[in-house]
Amino acid sequence: MGARLKEVYSTEIAPALVKRLQLKNVMEVPRVEKVVLNMGLGEAIQNIKVLESAVEELTRICGQKPVVTKAKKSIAQFKLREGMPIGCMVTLRRDKAYEFLDRLINVALPRVRDFKGVSKKGFDGRGNYTLGIREQLIFPEIDLEKVDKVKGLNVTIVTTAKNDEEGYALMEAIGMPFPKKAQD
């Protein structure tokens, strides 16, 4: 059985986007290529246990083991040397990407305190969308007793859209909770 959001995308969202974006066929419709989750941890320089807990939490959130990212350059002011572990990231593709987006939109984001919608300014000019999450506690997979420190993460949704308008149309159709125009 495939991801629920992927089935909805192929049966309802894609045909609707063909009409909305005035495309010639369904293969031109923008789609989600991958979802990248990144946790940058500056504290990992002093305390390696912070990194271990972040890796464990990211594994629980997306069901895939993250890769530990290392510093590319040495920066003396930050007491950082090249090759030191400073974060972790996961790349989700195909069904796992759609399953994660489904959980993010329908379960995690509604749990954010005082949530009014996600920013429309997260597009990069090429149709990709980046979203910052301030605390990992919004995901139901995280056990609150085991959390030692609140950590944020970045979620980048890479699409096949050619520009921001197509990317916005795709994100809106998938169900990304952008604020309504009256509040702008």
From Swiss-Prot:
GO terms for cellular component: ribonucleoprotein complex; ribosome. Coiled coil: none annotated. It holds the Pfam family Ribosomal_L5. GO terms for biological process: translation. InterPro entries: Ribosomal_uL5, Ribosomal_uL5_bac-type, Ribosomal_uL5_C, Ribosomal_uL5_CS, Ribosomal_uL5_dom_sf, Ribosomal_uL5_N. Keywords: Ribonucleoprotein, Ribosomal protein, RNA-binding, rRNA-binding, tRNA-binding. GO terms for molecular function: rRNA binding; structural constituent of ribosome; tRNA binding. Belongs to the universal ribosomal protein uL5 family. This is one of the proteins that bind and probably mediate the attachment of the 5S RNA into the large ribosomal subunit, where it forms part of the central protuberance. In the 70S ribosome it contacts protein S13 of the 30S subunit (bridge B1b), connecting the 2 subunits; this bridge is implicated in subunit movement. Contacts the P site tRNA; the 5S rRNA and some of its associated proteins might help stabilize positioning of ribosome-bound tRNAs. Part of the 50S ribosomal subunit; part of the 5S rRNA/L5/L18/L25 subcomplex. Contacts the 5S rRNA and the P site tRNA. Forms a bridge to the 30S subunit in the 70S ribosome. This is Large ribosomal subunit protein uL5. It comes from Syntrophotalea carbinolica (strain DSM 2380 / NBRC 103641 / GraBd1) (Pelobacter carbinolicus).
